[in-house]
A protein has these predicted regions:
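A secondary-structure capping/hinge motif
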Residues: 57-63, 106-118
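An amphipathic alpha-helical interaction segment
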Residues: 1-11
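Conserved hydrophobic/aromatic pocket- or pore-lining residues that grip, position, or stack substrates
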Residues: 1, 28, 53
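Short coil turns linking two alpha-helices in DNA-binding domains
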Residues: 45, 49, 98-99
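Terminal helix-turn-helix DNA-binding modules in bacterial transcription factors
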Residues: 40, 59-98, 120-136
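Residues within the alpha-helical elements of helix-turn-helix
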Residues: 45, 94-95, 110
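Short hydrophobic/aromatic patch on the recognition helix
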Residues: 52-54, 102-103, 107
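A short, Lys/Arg-enriched amphipathic alpha-helix from helix-turn-helix/homeodomain DNA-binding modules
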Residues: 12-37, 43-46, 67-86
Length: 136
């Protein structure tokens, strides 16, 4: 007996591949901070196979894993560009990285600069901005 697509675990009946891709993106962004975010978890949540999920992203020239890493890296960079008290390790761990050295390596590979350079620059700017303001 053949099962309907939904019961078989595919989401072809919910607006097609474009809609499923958008749902995958939304799920990923909602769970970026989870260090255990996986392709298995995403495909189960969307009700599709891992193979189909891979195909959705592959058709757009990126793998699911690359999409997750890029999104995490962009969020980390944005957070590092805000002067504050967070360390690089705190930022990396808060966005799902489990090793600060691994984070620094892939950050440099992706952006061409070490996260410490951005962090130091923003810390200096934050101190200068704070020093230029009159006391309250």
């Amino acid at each position: 007996m053949l099962l309907p697509f939904r019961e078989a675990g595919a989401s072809f009946d919910r607006g097609g591949p474009g809609a499923l891709y958008e749902r995958a993106q939304a799920f990923i962004h909602d769970h970026l901070r989870d260090p255990d975010l996986s392709i298995d978890q995403i495909s189960m949540a969307l009700g599709c196979t891992k193979r189909y999920l891979h195909m959705l992203f592959s058709d757009r020239g990126i793998t699911v894993s690359e999409y997750i890493w890029r999104a995490r890296l962009l969020n980390c960079r944005q957070e590092l560009e805000i002067p504050g008290n967070k360390t690089i390790t705190d930022v990396a761990f808060s966005w799902g990285f489990s090793s600060s050295s691994h984070f620094s390596r892939i950050f440099r590979k992706y952006f061409g600069i070490m996260p410490s350079s951005i962090h130091r620059s923003q810390q200096r700017n934050g101190l200068q901005d704070g020093a230029a303001q009159p006391p309250a």
